[in-house]
Each structure stands twice: as structure tokens, then as C-alpha cells.
């Protein structure tokens, strides 16, 4: 675990974080919670993008933090989407209790001001890459989060 205040560029630079919000548009309550949480997010951070289709290009170096609305599956999908450009992820659970997304939306409202000022801890997870080779040729490659 790492203290985010020692690693987060926005804290070191004294600026608001640039945040991407990722959510699965087909999940129950996603749109309702987006409408409720976006003003709160925007009051403490600069909203870079809202991605409801897991298609955002994370290769841009400008983003600081990803908020995922959903469950563990949504966080795993976001980690795959970020590939080699991993950012800290704050998972907000909109379904059953999750291992990675253990923060419920009501609690998010309480802790968000602390997160943006670096008063939180980041748990680092290992990313795995698996490639399949046939006759010396790479046929496919997948990346995943080791939870």
C-alpha cells in the first residue's frame, strides 16, 4: 500500500486532479448515480471524460485518477482498458458487495474530499499479461488485473 499524497502528481503540484469516470451504461442505477455524483466530483476535481462504453483512450498523460461506477467486473474491465497506462482507481460499488469496489455511493460522498487532498492509501495490484504463440507467431495477447 502506498500513501497517495507521496505519489499523486496533483497533490505534489497543488492542483485539482483530472478525473475520468468509467461506468457500464447497461448496469442498473448507473445513470441515476452519475447524475448525483458528477456535481460532487466536479466540485473537487476537473472532469476529463465520462466513459459509458469502456472505450476511452487512456494513453493521454493528462489524467490522474479513474472513478469506476459499478462492481468488481467494471473495475477489472477498466484495468484492461487502461492496459499499460494504469492510473489509481476509486471503485464505487453500485451492486452487491465487491472485493475491489467496496465503497458504496453514500460513503463516496464522505471520502471524496479526502481522496483529492491525498488523505488516502493506494493499494497496488499486479497486472498480468498472457500471450498465446503458435508456430512462433503471437496469436493473441490479454492483460488482466491480479486481484
Each language-model region and where it sits:
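N-terminal glycine-/serine-/threonine-rich phosphate-binding loop
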Residues: 2-70, 74-85
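Conserved beta-strand segments that form the floor/walls of ligand-binding pockets within enzyme
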Residues: 20, 93, 143
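Short, glycine/serine-rich, charged loops/turns that create anion-binding
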Residues: 26-27, 94, 104
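Alpha-helix termini
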Residues: 37, 77, 83-86, 104-111, ...
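Glycine-rich loops and low-complexity Gly/Arg-rich segments
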Residues: 44-48, 91-94, 114-117
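Gly/Ser-rich helix-loop-strand patches that form or flank binding pockets
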Residues: 77, 81-95, 99
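Catalytic core of DAGKc-family lipid kinases
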Residues: 99-147
